[in-house]
Design a protein with these regions (language model features):
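Sec-dependent N-terminal signal peptides
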Residues: 5-21
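Sec-dependent signal peptide cleavage junction
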Residues: 18-36
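A well-structured
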Residues: 33-40, 45-309
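C-terminal, non-catalytic "cap/extension" segments appended to globular domains
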Residues: 61, 186, 263, 378, ...
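Post-HExxH zinc-binding segment in Zn-dependent metallohydrolases
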Residues: 277-279, 400-430, 434-437, 441, ...
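Catalytic zinc-binding patch centered on the HExxH motif and its immediate surroundings
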Residues: 304-305, 339-361
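Short pre-active-site segment immediately N-terminal to the catalytic Zn-binding motif
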Residues: 359, 363-378
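Catalytic Zn2+-binding segment of zinc metalloproteases
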Residues: 383-396, 415
Length: 578
């Protein structure tokens, strides 16, 4: 168990939980889902379908008692409007803190600090809402500028808040701080350095602008990979300066600690690189072509006419059979329209779950492919959403363990596998194999992009030629075959730009997710219990290692299990197509 802390003056506020992109998406036929339509109407609203005084019961794999409900106002997404909030509008809140401290009024100081924190959270939420609007139309420069401006307003307001409390810590009434805050929080305020903070804010603004430039490039019909590489080179320079300012030996060390709060080092991650290359990459080499051919031979069209409602129906069907608490969360998501999975060619090509702090609720964003991936992307993001629905999030001091978060999401993908016959009919076998191979792909690419970026950020004088050479070397070491233009493949992965060194979390979490599949094959009820115990652990209070210890899943960082999982997958016929 851990206590999460965030030093806002130095660390970026990473507010987006991105969903896994580029995972070998394949299409799906709609016949099976269409045939389920009437049943879904019944299972989604049993009170309406059952006779008066009766409630239609659906047998679930698990019962209640895994989560504590979180109090919130029940609002639809359309009701969550904040607009822009400037740092100037925040200044009076900090002035109130100063005034209360000068009067040495404990009650007034408490009230001023509380109101300042709530307003700061509101500014952060406004930034998230505007980012969502911008991502819906990534071609709109005005929207992008507005979102960027709001994000900067949050950074500036957070800095003003810390500066104000730092001044209180140096004043004659500094004891007010120890009565209002925990000791570790007071230490943050005391250690605030205005000069370093201003440098950090300048670098953060440069980084945000470069990320915006990449988003604009990725929204085009065809990504200009050379331009994207140029943006990336500038990002590497800026982020390296951030690490130096923070006193870190390397940007990898800085990101692992400050952004992702991992309980292992970049050097430890090399164990995952090794198992990815030795145990999981051979599975991709052996089965990718065979499975692709089977998909082609099956006659499944690449454009299946999948609608958002098809995806929602599938989500509700599966969650209704997991547990009452999972079902409640899914129905709340749908009832209050807390998702955007509609298609638009203007959308940013990604998927993520964003927490809207002022409203105590998460929101799912996804740009669909019109393929089977639309379902698995939603199942994945709902794993994040479920955790956020029950646990909430601390906007100011919470630090997420993304490894645990990704096990909660990739584990949800695994738990849906048992419903594939109902959802996809005759295509279930091949699509189940594809989902499992996607998880193998997560292990391999999660390790590959971590190794790639660790090497990139370790270069003292990085050029574009050297950047591409490093990718070629790393790419080949994971068993992938070169093709024309492959050296720019990394530019299509948005995480490399928005959340550097995030991808190892996919690898670290996909391994126990595949282990969870073995439990699912033996006992769906036991697997559901295991998953819900993982989901019931807040990713701001626990590490992935805590969840693995609690549930008996293997910690691959300490006990290599890749060879065992790979062998069991093959022996079980997970990738065999009849």
């Amino acid at each position: 168990m851990r206590l999460g802390t965030r030093i806002l003056a130095l660390a970026l506020c990473v507010i987006l939980l991105l969903g896994l992109c580029g995972c070998l998406p394949v299409p799906v036929a709609q016949d099976a889902l269409d045939s389920l339509y009437e049943e879904l109407q019944q299972t989604q609203t049993p009170q309406e379908q059952a006779p008066a005084g009766q409630v239609q019961e659906i047998e679930t794999l698990a019962g209640d008692g895994y989560f504590e409900p979180l109090a919130r106002d029940e609002l639809d997404y359309d009701e969550m409007q904040l607009g822009e909030i400037t740092c100037e509008a925040y200044a009076p809140y900090c002035a109130a803190i100063t005034k209360a401290a000068e009067k040495n009024s404990r009650e007034a100081f408490h009230r001023a600090c509380y109101e300042a924190e709530q307003m700061l959270i509101k500014i952060d939420t406004a930034a998230s809402l505007l980012a969502l609007e911008s991502d819906r139309d990534a071609t709109d420069e005005a929207l992008a500028e507005r979102a960027l401006r709001q994000t900067q307003a949050y950074y500036d307001a957070a800095d003003l808040y810390h500066q104000t409390l730092h001044e209180v810590s140096e004043g004659e009434h500094s004891r007010l701080l120890s009565r209002e805050f925990e000791t570790w929080q007071v230490e943050i305020f005391k250690s605030y350095d205005q000069e370093a903070s201003q440098e950090s804010l300048t670098l953060s603004a440069q980084e945000s602008e470069l990320v915006r430039q990449y988003a604009a490039l990725s929204a085009q019909e065809e990504l200009d990979v050379d331009a994207a590489a140029d943006v990336y080179l500038e990002l590497v320079k800026v982020r390296s300066q951030m690490a130096e300012l923070a006193g870190s030996a390397s940007y990898a060390d800085y990101a692992y600690s400050a952004f992702y709060s991992r309980d292992y080092t970049p050097q430890d991650a090399q164990k995952i690189w090794q198992t990815a290359k030795e145990d999981f990459a051979p599975l991709l080499t052996k089965y990718s072509d065979t499975l692709s051919q089977a998909l082609s031979d099956s006659g499944i069209s690449s454009t299946g006419g999948i609608t958002g409602q098809n995806v929602i129906d599938a989500l509700l069907y599966g969650t209704a059979r997991m547990s009452p608490e999972v079902r409640e969360a899914a129905e709340y998501l749908v009832e209050h329209s807390l998702y955007d999975i509609s298609y638009s060619e203007k959308k940013l090509p990604t998927g993520y779950t964003s927490y809207l702090y002022s409203f105590e609720i998460p929101f799912i964003f996804n740009c669909p492919y019109d393929s089977y991936a639309d379902y698995t992307d939603m199942f994945h993001e709902f794993g994040h959403w479920l955790a956020g629905y029950y646990h909430g999030s601390d906007a100011l001091y919470g630090v997420i363990d993304y490894d645990l978060s990704e096990l909660q999401s990739q584990g949800m993908e695994v738990m849906f596998l048992q419903f594939y016959e109902d959802l996809f009919g005759d295509d279930a076998e091949i699509l189940r194999a594809q989902t499992l191979l996607n998880l193998v792909y997560s292990v391999v690419t999660g390790a590959m992009y971590d190794e790639f970026q660790q090497r990139i950020y370790a270069e003292s004088d990085l050029t574009k030629d050297r950047l591409l050479d490093i990718y070629r070397e790393v790419y080949a070491s994971y068993g992938f075959e070169p093709y024309d233009g492959y050296e720019y493949e990394w530019t299509e992965v948005i995480h490399n730009f928005q959340q550097p060194l995030y991808y190892i979390s996919y690898a670290v979490s996909a391994i126990p997710a595949l282990e969870l599949y073995a439990r699912l094959a033996e006992s769906p009820n036991d697997a559901m219990d295991t998953y819900l115990r993982v989901a019931s652990m807040s990713d701001e209070d626990y590490f992935l290692t805590d969840a693995l210890r609690e549930t008996g899943l293997t910690n691959s960082m300490k006990s290599p299990i890749g060879d065992v999982i790979a062998r069991e997958l093959e022996e079980s016929g997970a990738f065999d197509i009849s």
